[in-house]
């Protein structure tokens, strides 16, 4: 199993349009996408070999809307790119880590993703992502 790589850092925002600070810092939005199953509109900004993912809720009941309501805008998760998401999930579950998703679900860029509970990541929500070839 290859070592995971940092894919992106997810940042919850009320509005993608209001998050202009990143463009002022010289970053460019490379890709936007709505992931209806997760109730979120995303914008990816390239930062070297990684990305920032801005997450805007598409409705008041989305996970991101609830996160912003409870904690305000800010860092939501870190995402690690893996080559075999099922193997990683099976190993983590066998080791007793708490998973939000025991099986991958569709994510942005056509990737398969799964989240580990923040209790498993020292208070940090960790997303695993596998690119579909």
Spans of features found by a protein language model:
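Conserved secondary-structure micro-motifs at functional edges
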Residues: 54, 58-62
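Long, hydrophobic N-terminal alpha-helical segment
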Residues: 1-38, 47, 62
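Vicinal oxygen chelate
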Residues: 2, 13-21, 25-27, 34, 43-48, 52-53, 59, 70-119, ...
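A short local loop/turn or secondary-structure capping micro-motif enriched for an aromatic residue
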Residues: 61-64, 133
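Short, flexible, solvent-exposed loop/turn segments with mixed acidic/basic and small polar residues
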Residues: 1, 65-71
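Short connector loops at helix/strand junctions that flank enzyme active sites
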Residues: 40, 47-49, 70-75
């Amino acid at each position: 199993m290859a070592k995971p790589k940092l894919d992106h850092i997810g940042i919850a925002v009320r509005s993608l349009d209001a998050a202009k600070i990143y463009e002022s810092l010289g970053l460019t939005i490379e890709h936007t996408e709505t992931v209806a199953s997760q109730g979120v509109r995303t914008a990816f900004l390239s930062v070297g070999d990684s990305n920032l993912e801005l997450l805007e809720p598409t409705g008041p009941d989305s996970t991101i809307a609830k996160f912003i309501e409870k904690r305000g805008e800010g860092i939501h998760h870190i995402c690690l790119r893996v080559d075999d998401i099922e193997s990683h999930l099976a190993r983590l579950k066998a080791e007793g880590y708490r998973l939000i998703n025991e099986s991958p679900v569709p994510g942005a860029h056509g990737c398969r993703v799964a989240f580990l509970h923040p209790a498993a990541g020292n208070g940090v929500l960790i997303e695993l992502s596998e690119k579909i070839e």
